[in-house]
Amino acid sequence: MASWLRRKLRGKRRPVIAFCLLMILSAMAVTRFPPQRPSAGPDPGPMEPQGVTGAPATHIRQALSSSRRQRARNMGFWRSRALPRNSILVCAEEQGHRARVDRSRESPGGDLRHPGRVRRDITLSGHPRLSTQHVVLLREDEVGDPGTKDLGHPQHGSPIQETQSEVVTLVSPLPGSDMAALPAWRATSGLTLWPHTAEGRDLLGAENRALTGGQQAEDPTLASGAHQWPGSVEKLQGSVWCDAETLLSSSRTGGQAPPWLTDHDVQMLRLLAQGEVVDKARVPAHGQVLQVGFSTEAALQDLSSPRLSQLCSQGLCGLIKRPGDLPEVLSFHVDRVLGLRRSLPAVARRFHSPLLPYRYTDGGARPVIWWAPDVQHLSDPDEDQNSLALGWLQYQALLAHSCNWPGQAPCPGIHHTEWARLALFDFLLQVHDRLDRYCCGFEPEPSDPCVEERLREKCQNPAELRLVHILVRSSDPSHLVYIDNAGNLQHPEDKLNFRLLEGIDGFPESAVKVLASGCLQNMLLKSLQMDPVFWESQGGAQGLKQVLQTLEQRGQVLLGHIQKHNLTLFRDEDP
């Protein structure tokens, strides 16, 4: 029996040995090579080893196709293949006892090193589905300054470098979120002093921008950019826009439009200064005033010329006024510098169009005012220069009631603060037509219309006094629109019309900041350089010196009035 069992076992020895060898080889294969997981996307290409000091060499396949690169730019983190089970990913700081990972990789897009990237020791072990995506998301959560990304970085050429820049922004905020380092950082990164100034808001002589003719033109009071202007008095005084030595074309301003002009302003100024005149019409009862339609380059290529009414409904019209109305151009820039944004864009221009009568093409500069398509006019012939009929006594009553909304007498629906903006604007320019066309608040010259038309005789009866040019737009009926803003810049200081300020209990903070900063003259000089025809017609900075000094002095008088009567200041967002 024993000999039979021995022979039986000897016969089975070879299969058992073979089986044991097979098991050993299988175990060696399992332990020698890491498991591979199926890819969820396209083939990422060959794997490349990453040299790791102080840790076993680990082969990690990184997948970043072109579509994933785009998603990485948009989402702000890298996507990668899953890590092998029991593997270790180390993002170590540069210390001798810690592991360092070399992330360099050759590619057509360039070098992918991340020299400025924050490094941390992160060990991912024991989880087969944990990927590098989670590592970057963890770093995102640890970023201390969420606003750093919005400051931007200089752009690079390749898509891969752009992706790198996004990741660096997420994980490399300014050290300690030190906001004091922002000015120097902006200077080195090529950012402008006024980050809200949009790309393309350059001087009128620079490249043309396409003008789209929408049914409703963009509201200048709501357009992007200028709503952030101005900052504090200290920021104004320290800015290049207040610097007396800096010209608008200086490299310090970057050749950009001033920050108080919106994108809509720049587009309309360019249209008025460069648009081709394609149609015209006289304005009844307004003498030398012509309404003209302008065409953009795109519209000129169209064989069918649009009618004047079509152009005007698209915001592509302007009013050519008399040479004596050139101060309206200055008034527009005063409005924008003060942050009021209620006047319609205006430029000076010399016309050469064969469509215009000779007196418009004789080489003299004339003001051109943008025609807003939705300004409301009453149907009453006696009140057609108003959007609502308003007398002096009614005006004083609504000021006393602090009216904001319609439906309760005597409130017409115009925001209460609108009257303060109007009073400030008219006082600085000494525009009397709106609030005091009868010249009740000052001693007029014999040549003034209120004397020639014997209007001043009505000052004895306030019930007969009417306000004129009280206009709103249908797209924004709670805000006023200023027209006919030529003003009187030769009016002596001892004859200033303080009746324009009667009943006003506060003024816009933004405008008062500009007046208090002492920067009004220098800011207006830079703003007026946007209009080369007006600038040259007035004799440049030297020719404008006297009128700008007059405006500065009137601003100081207004500040004294505010202080004397202890009047309040309101923010732009206050109704």
Swiss-Prot record:
Superkingdom of origin organism: Eukaryota
Propeptide: 30-119, 437-575
Gene transcribed to yield this protein: GASK1A
InterPro entries (alphabetical): FAM198
Disulfide partners: none
A Pfam match: FAM198
Modification after translation (UniProt): O-glycosylated with core 1 or possibly core 8 glycans.
PANTHER family: GOLGI-ASSOCIATED KINASE 1A, GOLGI-ASSOCIATED KINASE 1B-RELATED
Record's protein name: Golgi-associated kinase 1A
Composition skew (Basic and acidic residues), residue ranges: 143-153
One GO CC annotation: endoplasmic reticulum
Outcome of mutating R437A: Abolishes proteolytic cleavage
Ranges for region Disordered: 143-162
Family to which this protein belongs: Belongs to the GASK family.
Tissue: Expressed in skin, lung and colon (at protein level).
Localisation: Secreted; Endoplasmic reticulum; Golgi apparatus; Membrane, Caveola
Organism per entry: Homo sapiens
TM spans (from-to): none
Swiss-Prot/TrEMBL site (Cleavage) positions: R119, R120, D436, R437
Keyword Secreted listed: yes
Main subcellular location: secreted
Signal peptide: 1-29
Keywords assigned: Endoplasmic reticulum, Glycoprotein, Golgi apparatus, Membrane, Secreted, Signal
Segments for region (O-glycosylated at one site): 53-58
Glycosylation-annotated residues: N566
